[in-house]
């Protein structure tokens, strides 16, 4: 009977006894000398071995006489008398070890190896060969215990089933869940891919303050902290936008930042209070240039990471290979609520009546632009499955965006949606200092009227604009939501290594 079967079948393992037994084993190791050695060096990871040698026959491997050193966690063990098979897991995947009593120094097999536990971290040296079933394996001539695991692993066959436990103990999730490990490898590839894409287009990566005296750049409720040395209340940033545009004023014409934002808001399948954004600012460009850049970025990432421009998400196939759909906000409302009379969206009372008829509670502080935006979010947003740009956002909900030259009630702004979710937001930047000052005042009035997500007045930013911001376009993309799309994940907590959780009482 294999050891992993035995552990999987025993659903009521006495954890205290297990811990006691393992601690006793560790105590014996301490008595024998160094319990946690740090002198073993591997020369291959499992994926390197599989890539290089899976295609070779056993006869070729024997002729090559290749000796390798690997290290990792013992995930399974099948003891068959004088020989055993072990599955070793490392960062690259898994490799099988063949462990024979007579091929190891005297006493290692019976007195050491057989007393080790699943989850222990081992170092192994030996020669490559293939079993009769064709599995690449290592015939061990040296086997060492590098780290004694005091706690047992989750059931090999059922894994870490409790969803909350997966988030609280992400390390166990990563040990036992191939899909979870792959998700975070893809996340890393996305971040690297974005950086390479941006640098290739002449952008410079920068870092801006995470703690700010005035939170700005988005409509959101901030977290408050206190700086003891300055005896000053500060805010965790809700966006880096205003600092990045200060850099454009200073002459850095193409900048981007990938970093955390913090918003003191609810938690849901698509919202986490601490999340990662990429923001970029490009001088002498407008929002139409950003549309091209966004399409190219997603297409490039999909091709380079997944090897194709079609991405499976749930039961749909997202196509990044063709141009994204482009609709104005009003066109989207009409498309997904055909009975809408477009003229009603130009009248406050008519628009308010539409909003209330579909269950929207209209706040006293809302103007026509906010109402139309809320109608769009209610009737259209969930239907935007394929990549879609929505343009012509009202100026009322776009306090930092440049007004449209033809219709000053709207801005040269877009948001883009994939899978029924907003993924990013871009616009031609407002560089009229006087207009910006007035919009800040409008935001202050909204805050005084009860809108706790309205922006603060940022006098220093207005001063920066008074020195002259070139015609500029800016874009923000939610990295977490992007990773959700590329990994077919349906809750944001699956793509954040350590999501916000209520403490266990």
Curated annotation (Swiss-Prot):
Primary location: cytoplasm
Cofactors (names): Mg(2+)
GO cellular component, one term: cytosol
Binding site for Mg(2+) 2: 422
EC number: 6.1.1.6
CDD domains attached to this UniProt entry: LysRS_core, LysRS_N
Reaction(s) catalysed by this chain's protein: tRNA(Lys) + L-lysine + ATP = L-lysyl-tRNA(Lys) + AMP + diphosphate
Molecular-function annotations in GO: ATP binding; lysine-tRNA ligase activity; magnesium ion binding; tRNA binding
Listed GO biological process terms: lysyl-tRNA aminoacylation
Swiss-Prot/TrEMBL keywords: Aminoacyl-tRNA synthetase, ATP-binding, Cytoplasm, Ligase, Magnesium, Metal-binding, Nucleotide-binding, Protein biosynthesis
Transmembrane segments: none
Subunit structure: Homodimer.
Family: Belongs to the class-II aminoacyl-tRNA synthetase family.
Protein name from the UniProt record: Lysine--tRNA ligase
Annotated source species: Shigella dysenteriae serotype 1 (strain Sd197)
The organism's taxonomic lineage, starting at the top: Bacteria, Pseudomonadati, Pseudomonadota, Gammaproteobacteria, Enterobacterales
Gene it is expressed from: lysS
């Amino acid at each position: 009977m294999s050891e992993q079967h035995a552990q999987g079948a025993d659903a009521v393992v006495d954890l205290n006894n297990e811990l006691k037994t393992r601690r006793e084993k560790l105590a014996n190791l301490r008595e024998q000398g160094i319990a946690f050695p740090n002198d073993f060096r591997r020369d291959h990871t499992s994926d390197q071995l599989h890539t290089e040698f899976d295609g070779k026959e056993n006869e070729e491997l024997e002729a090559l006489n290749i000796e390798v050193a690997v290290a990792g966690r013992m995930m399974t063990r099948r003891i068959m008398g004088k020989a055993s098979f072990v599955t070793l897991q490392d960062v690259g995947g898994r490799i099988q070890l063949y462990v024979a009593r007579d091929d190891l120094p005297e006493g290692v097999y019976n007195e050491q190896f057989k007393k080790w536990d699943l989850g222990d971290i081992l170092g192994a040296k030996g020669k490559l060969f293939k079993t009769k079933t064709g599995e690449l394996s290592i015939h061990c001539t040296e086997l060492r215990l590098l780290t004694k695991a005091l706690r047992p692993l989750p059931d090999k066959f059922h894994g870490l089933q409790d969803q909350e436990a997966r988030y609280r103990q992400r390390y166990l999730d990563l040990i036992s869940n191939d899909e979870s490990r792959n998700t975070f490898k893809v996340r890393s590839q996305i971040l690297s891919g974005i950086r390479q894409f941006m640098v290739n287009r002449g952008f410079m990566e920068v870092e801006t303050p995470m703690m700010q005296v005035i939170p700005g750049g988005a409509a959101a409720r901030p977290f408050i902290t206190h700086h003891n040395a300055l005896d000053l209340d500060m805010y965790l940033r809700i966006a880096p936008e205003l600092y990045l545009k200060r850099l454009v004023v200073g002459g850095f014409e193409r900048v981007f930042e990938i970093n955390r934002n913090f918003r003191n808001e609810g938690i849901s399948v698509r919202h986490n209070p601490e999340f990662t954004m990429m923001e970029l600012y490009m001088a002498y460009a407008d929002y139409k240039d950003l549309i091209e850049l966004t399409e190219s970025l997603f297409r490039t990432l999909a091709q380079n990471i997944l090897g194709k421009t079609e991405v499976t998400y749930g039961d749909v196939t997202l196509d990044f290979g063709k141009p994204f759909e482009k609709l104005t906000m009003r066109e989207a409302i009409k498309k997904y609520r055909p009975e809408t009379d477009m003229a009603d969206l130009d009248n406050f009372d008519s628009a308010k009546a539409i909003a209330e008829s579909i269950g929207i509670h209209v706040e006293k502080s809302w103007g026509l632009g906010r109402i139309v935006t809320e109608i769009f979010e209610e009737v259209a947003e969930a239907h935007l499955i394929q990549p879609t740009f929505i343009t012509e956002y009202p100026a009322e909900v776009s306090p930092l965006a440049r007004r449209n030259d033809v219709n000053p009630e709207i801005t040269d702004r877009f948001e883009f949606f994939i899978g029924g979710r907003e993924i990013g937001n871009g616009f031609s930047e407002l560089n009229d200092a006087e207009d910006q000052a007035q919009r800040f005042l409008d935001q202050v009035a909204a805050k005084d009227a009860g809108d706790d997500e309205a922006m603060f007045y940022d006098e220093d930013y207005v001063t920066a604009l008074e020195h002259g911001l070139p015609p500029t376009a800016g874009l923000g993309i939610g990295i977490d939501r992007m990773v959700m799309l590329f990994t077919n994940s349906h809750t944001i907590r699956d793509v954040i290594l350590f999501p916000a959780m209520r403490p266990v009482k």
